[in-house]
């Protein structure tokens, strides 16, 4: 969706992580809601649009001048992006199927010094601090950690829509599937979306209808790039003799792990599942020739659940007895969290429209109520004496 906004005089920043929400700035930054704009999807206020399928979007309108404040109050202080999803247009029934796939790669990696350069610079730092040089005898690696964690990503989008309309009735049904492999190894993201709308003209001046958008998302277990930029290149990635990933030098291992420990050994230790359902029902009545009264009741429900597993991780460390070190406290653990959010909105709009020759007038009066409820529950546990928690998602419950 962010690609649709490129060229719209907004700041758009994509982290590159699979399925991550892009950072969109319409009117800079303020102290209320940070930088995020207000999204209005089919009239319903939202703080993100990750659940939408780009193929189901009919139009997008950006408000970034004082009009965003005049209409939406302080909630529009960061700008407003108004999104209208697709509905049927009058005509014969149509079926549309499309699919796409692509690849993404890191084309401009951050330049880092090699092992020899790092040793020289680090010992110069120690010398300036009045400390003895570090003994790099056991640290003979020359590793570019960015090369180790990055991969060529893959993305695919597949969509189908069915639409049809007559003089009195129209419908739209759209379904989509998106899958993405990130640029960091083991990152995977998938999303299934559904969009349904139906409109019915009861009489010549009275119309009713509904709109529904739903999504099921499996977020990626994202990893940080920062460790790969900070880890010393003097460490080898893997020790073949012991069959273990190596630790970092003593001046770093207390602050961070070998980047590949996080990427490989902690891969698939987070299971997340997000559901989103958003929709509305409306009635629209035209009366007295120039007046229209519209009532819209909207609801948005989201449920995000996450389960995390802490495995026992052993690494090769030449500085300890036995050459094998266990990270952390050496205990398995699980944590579980569930967050639900419910938004209910009602809109009552009265519109007057008239035309006199070359002049036209449109006046609107409206009243909106908005209700938001957020619930969050989390818990964690570690293994008992000798009772190791299995590395099996079926057992990752508190």
Describe these PLM feature segments:
Residues 42-70:
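Short acidic/polar hinge/loop motifs at secondary-structure boundaries
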Residues 1-7, 11-12:
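Single conserved hydrophobic/aromatic residue that forms the stacking wall/gate
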Residues 17, 89-143, 168, 182-189, ...:
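Surface-exposed loop/interface segments of Gram-negative outer-membrane beta-barrel transport/assembly proteins
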Residues 9, 31-33, 46-48, 66-71, ...:
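Short beta-strands and strand-coil junctions in structured, solvent-facing domains, enriched
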Residues 22-28, 76-99, 158-161:
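N-terminal periplasmic accessory domains that precede
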Residues 13-20, 52-55, 72-77, 187-190, ...:
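Short, glycine-/polar-rich solvent-exposed loops and beta-turns at beta-strand/coil boundaries
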Residues 9, 43, 60-61, 81-83:
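Non-catalytic regulatory/gating segments with a bias toward low-complexity or hydrophobic composition
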């Amino acid at each position: 969706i962010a690609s649709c906004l490129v060229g719209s005089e907004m700041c758009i920043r994509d982290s590159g992580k699979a399925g991550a929400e892009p950072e969109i700035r319409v009117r800079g930054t303020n102290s209320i809601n940070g930088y995020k704009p207000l999204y209005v999807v089919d009239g319903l206020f939202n703080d993100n649009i990750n659940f939408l399928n780009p193929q189901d979007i009919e139009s997008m309108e950006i408000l970034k001048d004082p009009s965003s404040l005049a209409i939406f109050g302080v909630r529009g202080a960061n700008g407003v992006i108004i999104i209208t999803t697709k509905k049927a247009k009058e005509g014969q029934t149509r079926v549309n199927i499309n699919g796409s796939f692509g690849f993404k790669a890191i084309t401009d990696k951050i330049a880092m010094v090699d092992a020899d350069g790092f040793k020289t610079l680090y010992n110069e730092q120690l010398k300036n601090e009045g400390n003895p040089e570090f003994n790099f005898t056991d640290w003979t690696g020359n590793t570019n950690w960015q090369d180790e964690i990055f991969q060529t990503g893959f993305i695919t989008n597949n969509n189908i829509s069915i639409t049809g309309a007559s003089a009195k009735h129209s419908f739209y049904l759209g379904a989509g599937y998106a899958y993405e492999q990130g640029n960091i190894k083991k990152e995977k993201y998938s999303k299934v979306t559904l969009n349904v709308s139906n409109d019915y003209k009861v009489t010549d001046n009275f119309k009713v209808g509904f709109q529904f958008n739903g999504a099921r998302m499996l977020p990626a277990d994202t990893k940080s790039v920062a460790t790969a930029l900070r880890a010393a290149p003097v460490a080898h990635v893997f020790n073949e003799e012991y069959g273990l990933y190596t630790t970092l030098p003593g001046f770093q291992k207390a602050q961070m792990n070998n980047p590949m420990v996080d990427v490989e050994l902690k891969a698939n230790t987070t299971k997340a599942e997000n559901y989103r359902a958003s929709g509305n029902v409306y009635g629209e009545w035209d009366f007295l020739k120039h007046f229209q009264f519209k009532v819209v009741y909207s609801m948005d429900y989201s449920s995000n659940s996450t389960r995390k597993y802490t495995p026992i991780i052993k690494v090769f460390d030449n500085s300890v007895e036995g050459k094998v070190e266990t990270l952390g406290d050496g205990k398995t653990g699980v944590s579980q969290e569930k967050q639900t959010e419910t938004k209910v909105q009602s809109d009552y709009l009265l519109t007057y429209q008239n035309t006199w020759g070359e002049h036209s007038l449109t006046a609107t009066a409206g009243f909106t109520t908005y209700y938001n409820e957020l619930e969050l529950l989390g818990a964690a546990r570690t293994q008992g004496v000798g009772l190791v928690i299995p590395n099996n998602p079926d057992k990752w419950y508190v």
